[in-house]
Amino acid sequence: LRGRTEANNAEAQYAYSRLGKDVSYDIVNAGCIAYMAIFDKPATIALEWRKMYYRFKQGVPLFYHCSRGCDRVGTLTLLIEGVLGVSENDLCLDYELSSFCGKDGLRHRNERYLHPDYDFEAVMRTIKSYPGETLRDKFEYYLVRVCGVSASEIEAFRKGMIVPDVHWRPERPKR
C-alpha cells in the first residue's frame, strides 16, 4: 500500500499517513464533491482523476476513504466504476452497500452535514442525459467533455484495469 487519499472538507489534520512514511498521503480538501456537487466542480473531479491515474501509471495501489462517511468517496468510485463499464445495477449495489444502511434502509446522518444535493438518483439521471450509446460512454463523456480528463488516459486505465485472466482454463471433465 503506497498511496492513500482522504476525502475531507476540513483543514488538513495530518501531514503524513498513519500507514507509514513510505505511503504518500493526499487530502482531498475541496469541500463537498458528492452527489450533484460533482457537476459544479469539474476541475476538482479532474484533479482527483489525475491523482488516481498517476498512481495507476506508477503501479502504485491507492487506498482512499472519506473522513466522515462515504458520500464523497462513493461518488468518486461511481465515476471510476462507471468509466470502466460496470453495469448500472452493480453501480447502484456498490453505492448502496457503501452506505452501511440501518435496519430501516436509511443511513442516519448528522443534520449538520446534510447537503441539499444528496441525491444519488439525480446523479444517475444527469449522467444518463449525456450523449453516448452505453452508460460507460456517458460516464466517459462527463469525464472528458465536462471535466477535461484525457480520453487516452481513460482508455489506458481501462486496458490496465480490465485484463482478461489468461491463466484461467475451463475445468475439463474427468474421464
Where are these regions (language model features)?
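Ser/Thr-glycine-rich phosphate-binding loops at phosphate-binding pockets of nucleotides
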Residues: 68-73
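Cys-dependent protein tyrosine phosphatase-like superfamily
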Residues: 1-63, 75-175
